[in-house]
Amino acid sequence: KSAPSGQLQLAPEGTVVTVREAADAMIAISDNTATDLLIDRLGRAAVEAEVAATGSSDVAALTPFLTTREFFLLGWGRPDGRAQWRDADVAERRQILAGLAERTIDSNPVDPAPADLDYVGIATRPATADGIGWYANGSDLCAALASLAVGPQNDVVRQILAQNPGGEFDPARWTYAGYKNGNAPGEVAGAWLLTDTAGQDWVISTQLASDTPIGPLDNAAAFELVTRSSSFL
């Protein structure tokens, strides 16, 4: 189980979750545990191969590909693994991740002070400079979403992505809106798949980041830039 956001981290051990249910939860409410279930089902190697296949500009920065649980433990666990991770090569990083397998996360602590994660630090201590996270530029995000739009079972993919459109788009201009966002301390990113009334697909991405300790960024304010700019496409 991972830390919030989401709901599946609160589900009892042994709860059966289908692939579709996990995908729905990952998109609809950014359920981190659902995301990790999908990574586990596919296998880390398959996810890393897909990163390369979509033409990522920096495959090395996404290798090994972290689960959200590993992300939290490395960046804000007690103890955290920032220094060890920062100085490690790929093989050493895989060993570090193997060492996290038995560690657990109390995703709903009664008192966050003695919890196994620094829950205050999650909101205030960015880990980007330590190499902890998922690295992509705007073109990478667009390429990944575009590959889903034309890939296998893209009709199902579109149904899933449409559960959270990430804003209000003019229905007179856009017949479809699908979306996925991501948040980390000091970072907000989002990508949209839009279809206009002529049937043309458009892919848009936005990213905001800071290396300094800041509080949670307002998604609505950040992504309003996209909904407003969509009228100019």
Spans of features found by a protein language model:
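Short, charged/polar low-complexity linear motifs in solvent-exposed/disordered segments
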Residues: L8-L10, A52-G55, N219-F223
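Short alpha-helical "patches" and their helix-cap loops
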Residues: K1, A46-T54, N154-G166
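Mid-domain, small-residue-enriched loop/turn segments at the edges of structured enzyme/sensor domains
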Residues: T15, I29-D140, A144-L145
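A charged helix-plus-loop insertion that forms the helical arch/lid used to bind
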Residues: E13-V17, E21
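Structured C-terminal helix/loop/strand segments within mature extracytoplasmic catalytic/sensor domains
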Residues: L100-L233
